Amino acid sequence: MKRIDAIIKPSKLDDVKAGIHALGVTGLTVFEVKGYGRQKGHTEMYRGTEYTVEFLPKIMLSVIVVEDLVEPVVKAITDSARTGKIGDGKIFVTSLDDVIRIRTGERGRDAI
C-alpha cells in the first residue's frame, strides 16, 4: 500500500478529484494549507502599499492506494493539476505499513 500526498492549486481540486474518481478510487482526504516553494510568495499592492505574501493558499490531498494504482493516480493528478506555470505543486509517494478501519477493525487492503 502507498500513500499519495499532492499539493495543488485550489482551482484544480475538482479536476483532480474527478481524475482520481475515474480510476475507481473512492477515498480522498483534503486539507486547506498554505506554503511556498521556489516562487517564495509574491508581492501585492493594497491601497498604494506593497505587501509581501509569503505563504500561498494551496490544497493538499491524500489518498491511500494499492501498488497497482500508484502510477495511474499520479498520472491523473499531474494531468489534472498541471498548468505549466510555477506553483502547480508537488506529489509525494510514501510506503504505508498498515491501515486500520476503526469501525470494523479491518486491516490492510480490506481497510482501504
Regions found by a protein language model. Give the residues of each.
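Positively charged, small/polar-rich N-terminal and surface patches that mediate targeting and assembly
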Residues: 1-112
